[in-house]
Amino acid sequence: MSVLNTKINTSPRAYMLVKERGPFVIDVTVTPNTNFPYSYAITNTMSINLDSSYSDKNISWKSESGNTRITITGSVNSTESYLFLIKSDIEQNVTINIKNRNSSTTTTTNASSSDSSMYNTTRSTQRRVTYDDDDDEYDDKNYFGWSSSNGISDNITTSKFSEIFKKFSLLQWVLVAALAFFMYYFLWKKNRRGSDDYTTGSVYDMPLIDTPIRDSYRLPQSFKRDALYRTSI
């Protein structure tokens, strides 16, 4: 069983069932429970060229409102697959629950899930995305994506920050933390407290030159705390 909470609008969202024998059922629940109409279509992918964009005129759309159950009893094998599409005139939230069972056992319309089933979802832009066994994207072609793992693969809401975090190993994070500590302690904190070395310390810690001309300038702060300079004037 595979459940997906998603948002639909005028751009069709598609889900594909492959390498599985029917029947399977699809429960569509409008969230929250409203009766606003939406349209769905189920078609054999043999009738659609997946290497090019499908058009509405080639698909038989059915209008529905509220919650509904859609039952398909056809055979789905290695050479045949089904495509479930759903869209709405206005943007709304829906829950899609796809369930199926291998035909080697007795099935009902309320079939249970099968471990061998594979589902897929396309992006609203119909960009093709392919995933390997670790759900890593390794292919970028034209339209539909295929998932090699169970359940629905939908990478639309994946945060870009989480993608960055996943690419960093523990050692890399330690190195980043060490660099941040070095910059704070040696480059910022040390300069803030000053030092006797005029090349790294504060400008007010430069040695006072004991010449008459120095009286025409503002005395540095170090003068106030240096006994030698206090007595020199």
UniProtKB/Swiss-Prot annotation:
Residues 102-124 have a biased composition (Low complexity). One of its GO terms (cellular component) is membrane. Glycans are attached at N58, N77, N93, N102, N110, N120, N155. Its main location: membrane. Coiled coil: none annotated. The chain crosses the membrane at residues 168-188. Residues 102-132 are annotated as: Disordered. Keywords: Glycoprotein, Membrane, Transmembrane, Transmembrane helix. It is a single-pass membrane protein. It is found in: Membrane. Belongs to the ascovirus HvAv ORF58 family. This is Uncharacterized protein ORF149.
